[in-house]
Regions:
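Catalytic metal-binding/acid-base residues of hydrolase active sites
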Residues: 15, 67-69, 121
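Soluble non-cytosolic domains of exported or imported proteins
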Residues: 24, 81, 85, 94-101, ...
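Boundary at the C-terminal end of the N-terminal hydrophobic targeting segment
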Residues: 2-6
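Histidine-rich, glycine-flanked metal-binding segment
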Residues: 14, 18-58
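N-terminal post-signal-peptidase region of extra-cytosolic proteins
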Residues: 16, 45-48, 97-101, 117
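Polyanionic/metal-chelating signatures
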Residues: 103, 108-225
Length: 225
């Protein structure tokens, strides 16, 4: 739609998030990429009119766990911005999000308009997930940044038991940093693990209930842990 022009969609079965649910034989008026009015037999000055003939119209779908915008081709390392060898829990993928990814138009055609893009890792913590609009606009793509910390005790390299112990130890270290009101050292973590101040800050946000910790679990024992 050209900026400033209006689009009128007529006679659709509109599924809303309101208590009334489905509004049958309903019109939708869109201008400048925004829904302006919803109702029956709308009288508006629209430059373009499309008759839906009872087709279903829904709000945009959300991809709640994806690498949209941060991975282009999985097998090509140069096109992957979903992982880091420097950071773990503190990895934020916001600055790497590509609103012009070739995968975005494909997903838009399937009705997906929003993504929760999640970094990945073979270790315990993969990093911080952020929510983006698939508007293809560099300025308007970010919805919410660093809203959840993701990890896994059941996939990737290493023992499940070791990951569970590291989960306990890393949260314990972060809690002691909170109690000390500042960063001191990583005492209590294995020498092979390396946590930056950025990583510890992310764990502190989890402990203070500012953001959730989402951990992948593939076994009943993982969940019971």
């Amino acid at each position: 739609i050209v900026q400033g022009e209006g689009l009128l969609l007529k006679g659709g079965n509109v599924h809303t998030a309101d208590p009334e649910g489905v509004q049958k034989n309903t019109d939708i008026y869109i201008k400048d990429g925004k829904i302006i009015k919803i109702g029956k037999d709308l009288q508006v000055d629209a430059s373009r009119v499309e008759d839906l003939n009872g087709k279903i119209v829904t709000p945009g779908f959300i991809a709640p766990y994806s690498q949209l915008g941060i991975v282009e081709i999985e097998a090509v390392a140069e096109t992957r911005d979903d992982r880091s060898t420097v950071y773990s829990s503190g990895l934020s993928i916001v600055s790497a999000f590509n609103p012009h990814s070739t995968l975005i138009p494909y997903n838009l055609r399937g009705g997906i308009t929003t993504t929760l893009s999640v970094p990945s890792s073979s270790g315990l913590y993969s990093g911080l997930a952020s929510s983006f609009s698939l508007s293809s606009s560099l300025e308007g793509s970010l919805i919410s940044r660093d809203i959840a910390l993701f990890g896994s005790v059941s996939s990737g390299e290493g023992s499940r038991a070791a990951k569970m112990l590291l989960l306990e130890d890393s949260l314990d270290v972060a809690s002691r940093v909170i109690e000390a009101n500042g960063w001191n050292d990583e005492k209590g973590l294995p020498s092979s693990s390396s946590y930056s101040s950025r990583d510890i800050i992310a764990l502190k946000r989890v402990l203070s209930r500012e953001i959730p910790l989402v951990v992948r679990a593939d076994r009943a024992s993982d969940i019971l842990f």
